[in-house]
């Protein structure tokens, strides 16, 4: 295979098309397509008697439900369906039918044109006016040709579904605005804390950061300009969907240009950094007092921010001593562990101001619980260390921190005072880190206190519920006690009455016993007197007495037997009474049953009579209908004959002349024909024109 090299100079460039004519042709074709679709849908509506444009919002609703189920879950999709269904029901019930159909059709076509690529322009507005005019002038009044009951739910959905989407859109817009407001507030706080941190840095590092930032901005601007120019050169001129291309420049840059611009920015920043280091070595003697002033300003700003941010430190006054101890221990342990990290952040570019998050800034500037405690001690210790380093130059080399051994090569040319100031800044940062740790501890303690408070509140609620239950039980017990007291009073009254009755019965029994004793005494006296008088008859009397006693025993036994028989008879009598009562009830029921049977028989007889009467009436009605049909047929025949006669009369009148003149031309008197209206009888008729059936007059 031979390789064929193409001649690049002979390549043909694509022909440039006129964008204006292309846009006009595309737009006209688009609007013609709209008109054709609209006409076809209206034709289908008229032919099939159904409004097919109402199916488009239903299809949009199904798509939105599917998307919500796919991306937001089943719960949100069910909630969305319920809200849309409720809105549809409200529109279906409270909007009149004609206005509902008008609003639904108008919304569908306006929304269909609104979803195009053109937006609001003169052709779309003209189409909207056309659609609204057709709907209001023609289709608003003509609802007879459509299935109203079938189309009405879809029309209600065409109004209810956009209302629901508008509500969700308004909610998302409000949430978006609130989120932007919150972002702006957080951005302002972050800028404030970044400004504080940048002002706390030495001025030479501020200058270095400012120059690096300007270099990065210049490099980014150059890269954006280059990418924009390349995009303008290589942008396609072919329009899609009737719109001219190349109007929206893309912000994507080429990777080669990005790499070159980044390398150029890095080289410029390195050159400026070396120049600033040389300039710093010559002007370090004049910067030292300004650095001291900046350190004092940084301490003042930190104290001000601590006093501003920690207004809640009064709530933790009882634990202040404990927090001071924790702060001192954590500061002593964290200075050695975080010194290397803080040193790297300080030497890398701005003292860690660019790498820390906004939340980190917030905790760093508002973490000390008492604004006059650890922060003031840290500032005083840093000042004392600074004085010792400035005053004692002999012992400074032997008592240096281990961090000084990690000084990079680009800072060897700096004076020792500046290095010591940087170490002081590192110590301050370590103190800030310790204060952050203490703040985290305090927050954890606050969280634990909050959880304990919640648990105590829940326990308090449970105790309140138990107290309410106990109060209810106590109330019920008091009510039961009162009822028991009332029943006890009633029982005591009954007991007193029974005791009184018992005392009366005992009195009667004692009186009867006394009477019996008196009778027995009198009988004994009489017997003694008789025995005394009749001593001879004692034996016979004794026999008689024994016989009488035997008879008395027999009589008592007979009395007991009779009493048992009487009891049995009483039981039988009671049973007979019950049986008689039952018989009376059965007699009443039988009488009621017989009365009901008589009533039912009477009702059946009356019902049969009514059915006979109804049958007679129906037969009479059928006869009357048949006679009426016969009479109507005769009337129709007569009407047909009258029409034929009228037609014949019209033909005769059309053939014969209307006026007949005599032979005398001088007089020329018109002769009235015999078929003229003058010969008609104008006397009023006695017939009723509104009568359904002809009735002859009675003479």
UniProtKB/Swiss-Prot annotation:
Annotated TM spans: 28-48, 75-95, 120-140, 154-174
- Sugar attachment sites are 241, 267, 345, 365, 690
Instruction: Give the way it sits in the membrane.
Output: Multi-pass membrane protein
Annotated keywords: Cell projection, Endoplasmic reticulum, Glycoprotein, Membrane, Nucleus, Transmembrane, Transmembrane helix
Q: Where is the composition biased (Low complexity)?
A: 329-346, 366-382
What Pfam family is a match, any one? Answer: Macoilin
Q: Which cell locations does it reside in?
A: Nucleus membrane; Cell projection, Axon; Rough endoplasmic reticulum membrane
Ranges of biased composition (kind: Basic and acidic residues): 257-271
According to the record, the residues making up region (Disordered) are 219-289, 322-411, 432-451, 679-699
Q: Name one GO cellular component term.
A: rough endoplasmic reticulum membrane
Highest taxon of source: Eukaryota
Listed under GO biological process in this entry are: chemotaxis; neuronal signal transduction
Q: Which GO terms describe its molecular function?
A: microtubule binding
Q: Which PANTHER family match?
A: MACOILIN, MACOILIN-2 ISOFORM X1
Q: Which family does it belong to?
A: Belongs to the macoilin family.
What job does this protein perform?
May play a role in the regulation of neuronal activity.
According to UniProt, the name of this protein is Macoilin-2
Q: Which organism is it from?
A: Danio rerio
């Amino acid at each position: 295979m031979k390789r064929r090299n193409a001649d690049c100079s002979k390549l043909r460039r694509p022909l440039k098309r006129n964008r204006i004519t292309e846009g006009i042709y595309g737009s006209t074709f688009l609007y013609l397509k709209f008109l054709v679709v609209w006409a076809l849908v209206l034709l289908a509506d008229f032919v099939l008697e159904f409004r097919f444009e109402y199916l488009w919002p239903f299809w949009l609703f199904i798509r939105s439900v599917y998307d919500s189920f796919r991306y937001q879950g089943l719960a949100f999709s069910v909630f969305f369906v319920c809200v849309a269904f409720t809105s549809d029901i409200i529109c279906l019930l409270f909007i009149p039918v004609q206005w509902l159909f008008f609003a639904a059709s108008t919304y569908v076509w306006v929304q269909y044109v609104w979803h195009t690529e053109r937006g609001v322009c003169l052709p779309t507005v003209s189409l909207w006016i056309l659609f609204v005019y057709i709907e209001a002038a023609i289709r608003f009044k003509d609802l007879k040709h459509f299935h109203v009951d079938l189309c009405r739910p879809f029309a209600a959905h065409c109004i209810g579904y956009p209302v629901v989407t508008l509500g969700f859109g308004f909610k998302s817009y409000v949430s978006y605005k609130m989120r932007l407001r919150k972002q702006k507030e957080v951005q302002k706080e972050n800028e404030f804390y970044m400004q504080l941190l940048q002002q706390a840095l030495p001025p030479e590092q501020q200058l270095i950061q400012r120059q690096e930032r300007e270099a990065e901005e210049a490099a980014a601007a150059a890269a954006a300009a280059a990418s924009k120019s390349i995009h303008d050169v290589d942008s396609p001129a072919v329009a899609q969907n009737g719109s001219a291309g190349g109007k929206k420049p893309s912000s994507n840059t080429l990777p080669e240009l990005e790499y070159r611009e980044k390398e150029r920015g890095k080289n410029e920043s390195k050159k400026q950094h070396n120049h600033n280091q040389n300039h710093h070595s010559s002007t370090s003697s004049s910067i030292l007092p300004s650095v001291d002033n900046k350190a004092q300003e940084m301490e003042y700003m930190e104290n001000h921010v601590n006093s501003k941010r920690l207004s809640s430190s009064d709530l933790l006054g009882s634990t202040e001593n404990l927090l001071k101890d924790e702060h001192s221990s954590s500061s002593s342990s964290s200075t050695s562990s975080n010194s290397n990290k803080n040193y790297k952040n300080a030497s890398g570019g701005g003292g860690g101001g660019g790498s820390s998050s906004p939340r980190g800034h917030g905790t760093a500037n508002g973490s000390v619980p008492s604004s006059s405690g650890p922060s003031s001690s840290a500032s005083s210790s840093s000042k004392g260390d600074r004085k010792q380093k400035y005053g004692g130059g002999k012992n400074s080399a032997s008592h240096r921190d281990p961090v000084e051994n990690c000084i990079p090569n680009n800072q060897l040319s700096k004076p020792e005072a500046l290095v010591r100031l940087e170490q002081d800044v590192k110590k301050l940062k370590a103190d800030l880190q310790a204060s952050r740790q203490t703040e985290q501890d305090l927050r954890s303690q606050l969280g634990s206190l909050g959880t304990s408070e919640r648990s105590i509140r829940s326990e308090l609620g449970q105790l309140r519920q138990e107290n309410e239950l106990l109060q209810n039980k106590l109330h019920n017990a008091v009510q039961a006690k009162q009822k028991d007291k009332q029943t006890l009073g009633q029982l005591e009254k009954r007991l007193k009455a029974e005791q009184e009755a018992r005392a009366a019965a005992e009195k009667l029994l004692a009186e009867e016993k006394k009477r019996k004793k008196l009778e027995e005494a009198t009988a004994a006296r009489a017997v003694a007197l008789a025995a005394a008088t009749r001593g001879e008859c004692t034996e016979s009397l004794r026999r008689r007495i024994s016989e009488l006693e035997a008879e008395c025993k027999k009589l008592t036994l007979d009395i007991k037997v009779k009493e048992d028989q009487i009891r049995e008879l009483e039981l039988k009598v009671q049973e007979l009474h019950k049986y008689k009562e039952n018989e009376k009830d059965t007699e009443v029921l039988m009488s009621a049953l017989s009365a009901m049977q008589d009533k039912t028989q009477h009702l059946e007889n009356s019902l049969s009579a009514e059915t006979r009467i109804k049958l007679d009436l129906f037969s009479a009605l059928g006869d009357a209908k048949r006679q009426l049909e016969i009479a109507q047929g005769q009337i129709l025949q007569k009407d047909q004959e009258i029409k034929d006669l009228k037609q014949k009369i019209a033909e005769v009148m059309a053939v014969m002349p209307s006026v007949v003149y005599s032979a005398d031309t001088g007089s020329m008197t018109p002769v009235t024909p015999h078929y003229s209206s003058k010969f008609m009888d104008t006397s009023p008729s006695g017939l009723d024109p509104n009568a359904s059936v002809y009735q002859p007059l009675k003479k």
